[in-house]
Amino acid sequence: MAARTGNDPATDVRTTILTAAESCFERFGITKTTMEDVARAADMSRATVYRYFSDRESLIIESVARRARLNMTPARAFIAKWPTIEERLVEGICQNVESGLRDPMVHLLVSPSEMTLANSLLTTSGKAVELTSELWEPILREAQEAGDIRADIDLTLLCEWISELEIMCISQLNGGTGSLERFREKIRTFLIPSLLPAGD
């Protein structure tokens, strides 16, 4: 069988739809965007859009996931620069918050008008925790195996907590309350000591 060349057409169509959806979200707002709006922006029929995405909610979730995964490699490289797990957690979480604040899609999701929908989608779908685990679980597992964090910590639960902390901080900073430096200090003061082995 001949080797396949070029891009996967299905992937190209999905990307086109997602790009169109994101432009509609920015133009109309997430809750007011319809599948018809997306189809029109993508220059496709609604039937084609529905063939790839069952509803607007699945579009939102995949958009968030796509953008997060594009940031995964640079995020890992940034975290790896720090010599200790304490610094990796503090600086890595703060960097993720900063990236979220710069991302127009995340910026929309955590705005007051969209926050209820965002919380429902990302929490109910488990996507926020899944994405946080993709980034953090290998780093945390390595630290746990090296004895740098407690052996009894449930890493899945810890990733869930990190996800919630990041979403909360992005929401607060996006709303004009709090500061990243104060958030950094809270992580250093409360999160880090809870993870370290006794005696550290």
Where are these regions (language model features)?
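Hydrophobic alpha-helical connector segments
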Residues: 62, 73-105, 158-162, 184
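Amphipathic alpha-helical packing segments from all-alpha helical-bundle domains
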Residues: 119-148, 156-160
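C-terminal peripheral helix-coil segments that are non-catalytic and often amphipathic
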Residues: 1-4, 95-98, 133-146, 163-165, ...
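Amphipathic alpha-helical segments used for helix-helix packing
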Residues: 100-123
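Basic, helix-initiating cap at the start of DNA-binding domains
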Residues: 1-28, 32-44, 58
